């Protein structure tokens, strides 16, 4: 088993009290054809070429990565990113991931899917999300985000 984790960050995007979910391409190795929220891996290009002398330096690297991933996968801009929960997991192929889930508000743009990643998109209510074949845990994260929007905060629990 590897000693290091890939770092993944995901966005639970809210717009008009609905959440964006995407269906993963049937060709994806992990969770093909299942519904999830946009996100992706932290890559060295997200920070390594930012000189130390800049105002931002290497701060907010997760937020920058999340904005890049949402832009690439869905064509949208997001704002007001806040932490929801985290998950450490071991995939069937033995790879280790640390997944950091965030709540973000829709800012602008029209959905433009990255076809090699996803093939469908839907804006759903929390109850409507139950009708989709979601990756395990996604509904729970949507529920947590929904509670945060209502002014409640808590640690992860099954919805």
List the predicted regions and their residue ranges.
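Acidic, metal-coordinating catalytic segment for phosphate/diphosphate chemistry
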Residues: 1-10, 16, 24-27
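Short hydrophobic/aromatic beta-strand or adjacent loop that forms the aromatic wall/cage
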Residues: 6-10, 97-101, 139
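A structural signal for short, well-ordered beta-strand segments
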Residues: 11, 83, 102-104
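Conserved Nudix-box catalytic region and its N-terminal flanking loop in Nudix hydrolases
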Residues: 18-68
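Nudix hydrolase/Nudix homology domain
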Residues: 33-35, 40, 44-48, 101, ...
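A short coil-to-beta-strand element that immediately follows conserved catalytic motifs
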Residues: 76-86
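Active-site-adjacent beta-strand/loop module that shapes the phosphate/pyrophosphate-binding cleft
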Residues: 87-110, 149
């Amino acid at each position: 088993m590897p000693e290091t984790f890939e770092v993944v960050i995901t966005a639970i995007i809210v717009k008009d009290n609905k959440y964006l979910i995407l269906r993963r391409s049937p060709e994806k190795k992990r969770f093909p054809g299942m519904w999830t929220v946009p996100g992706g891996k932290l890559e060295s290009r997200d920070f390594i070429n930012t000189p130390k002398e800049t105002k931002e330096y290497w701060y907010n690297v997760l937020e920058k990565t999340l904005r890049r991933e949402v832009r690439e996968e869905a064509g949208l801009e997001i704002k007001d990113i806040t932490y929801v929960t985290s998950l450490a997991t071991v995939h069937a192929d033995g790879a280790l991931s640390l997944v950091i889930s965030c709540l973000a508000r829709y800012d602008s743009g029209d959905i433009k899917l990255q076809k090699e990643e996803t093939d469908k998109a839907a804006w759903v209510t929390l109850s409507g999300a139950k009708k989709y074949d979601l990756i395990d845990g996604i509904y729970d994260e949507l529920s947590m985000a929904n509670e945060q929007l209502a002014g409640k905060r808590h640690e992860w629990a099954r919805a």
